[in-house]
């Protein structure tokens, strides 16, 4: 979550007049994250999140995201519930951007997760996959393997200024991943961005999942690979096998992996790491001037890739055969 578009008091008041959510008490921008402009809203009726969708989010995808959150919430998954206005619409316009209000989830993200947090996450991820099985809409993953080379083209000339040798390593990774990317794995709705700041806990109990704006239709095991990258490494590239084992075990307690998914885990983890390295690299080199935003370091995923290149099978990620 971040702020790219500033919202005036007058514009906000006009926008909120369409909603039956009480009178505004306070309004504050959220500086975390990288995709949209997000604000805390506190009203006489409760707490909400207001999101203005910025340019990387395609407007035609918004009905998928809004519909998915409503679908998952209706099936008992703890996620933001879109708030519809008095006319029954979940999407509006604010400051020239598409905008929506969703319910506020209680809990906090965990900055230094342990194995039990990872086990909880694995279980919640499998429950998300199960809850989304009958969701009727489809959205292609537009940040999967076919998108990585075009992304790299935007940053290739400057890559080595961020980290020496990064361009050559990325070219090698792309060649391997494009040749060996698995097809036809079990799939459906995935979150695709379940980093620690998108998962809330109250104590050690998982209380909610947020930020569904990369959700798409893809392989379930790829979503697991994203989580392994996001939760089980330190910024210096140190891998925590106990956390990975707990994450996978939590997932398989709800949905056991098929043999093809287990076999594909190393290549999926390598691809997931490259995907986040590339989007971070492009963002690192193109931060809008004056934006209230914290660009994330692509080198963290370059370090993770060192581990993934050496991984032989799922045992290296803590899953016993």
From Swiss-Prot:
Nucleus as a keyword of this entry, yes or no, is: no
Pathway annotation: Amino-acid biosynthesis; L-threonine biosynthesis; L-threonine from L-aspartate: step 4/5
The UniProt record lists the EC number as 2.7.1.39
Protein name, per record: Homoserine kinase
Q: Which domain of life is it from?
A: Bacteria
Q: Which UniProt keywords apply?
A: Amino-acid biosynthesis, ATP-binding, Kinase, Nucleotide-binding, Threonine biosynthesis, Transferase
Q: What class of enzyme is it?
A: transferase
Entry similarity comment? Belongs to the pseudomonas-type ThrB family.
Q: Which HAMAP family does the record cross-reference, listed alphabetically?
A: Homoser_kinase_2
- Catalytic activity of the protein: L-homoserine + ATP = O-phospho-L-homoserine + ADP + H(+)
Q: Which GO terms describe its biological process?
A: threonine biosynthetic process
GO MF terms listed in the record are: ATP binding; homoserine kinase activity
């Amino acid at each position: 979550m971040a702020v790219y578009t500033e919202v005036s008091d007058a514009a906000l008041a006009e926008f909120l007049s369409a909603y039956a959510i009480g009178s505004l008490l306070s309004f504050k921008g959220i500086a975390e994250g990288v995709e949209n402009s997000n604000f805390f809203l506190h009203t006489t009726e409760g707490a909400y999140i207001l999101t203005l969708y910025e340019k990387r989010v395609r407007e035609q995808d918004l009905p998928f995201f809004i519909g998915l959150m409503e679908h998952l919430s209706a099936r008992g998954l703890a996620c933001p519930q879109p708030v519809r206005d008095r006319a029954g619409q979940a999407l509006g316009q604010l400051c020239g951007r598409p905008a929506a209000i969703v319910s506020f989830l209680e809990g906090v993200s965990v900055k230094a997760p342990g194995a039990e947090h990872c086990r909880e996450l694995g279980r919640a991820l499998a429950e998300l996959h199960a809850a989304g099985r009958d969701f009727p809409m489809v959205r292609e993953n537009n940040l999967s393997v076919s998108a990585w080379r075009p992304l790299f083209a935007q940053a290739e000339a400057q890559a080595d200024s961020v980290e020496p040798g990064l361009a050559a390593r990325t070219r090698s990774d792309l060649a391997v991943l494009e040749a060996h990317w698995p097809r036809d794995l079990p799939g459906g709705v995935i979150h695709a961005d379940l980093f620690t700041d998108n998962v809330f806990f109250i104590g050690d109990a998982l209380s909610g999942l947020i930020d569904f704006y990369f959700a798409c239709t893809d392989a379930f095991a790829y979503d697991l690979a994203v989580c392994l990258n996001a939760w089980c490494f330190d910024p210096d590239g140190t891998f925590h096998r106990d956390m990975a084992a707990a994450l996978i075990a939590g997932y398989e307690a709800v949905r056991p992996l098929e043999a093809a998914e287990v076999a594909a885990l190393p290549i999926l983890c390598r691809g997931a790491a490259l995907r986040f390295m590339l989007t971070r690299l492009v963002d690192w080199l193109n931060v809008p001037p004056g934006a209230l935003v914290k660009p994330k370091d692509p080198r963290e995923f370059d370090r993770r890739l060192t581990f993934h290149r050496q991984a032989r099978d799922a045992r290296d990620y803590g899953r016993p055969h």
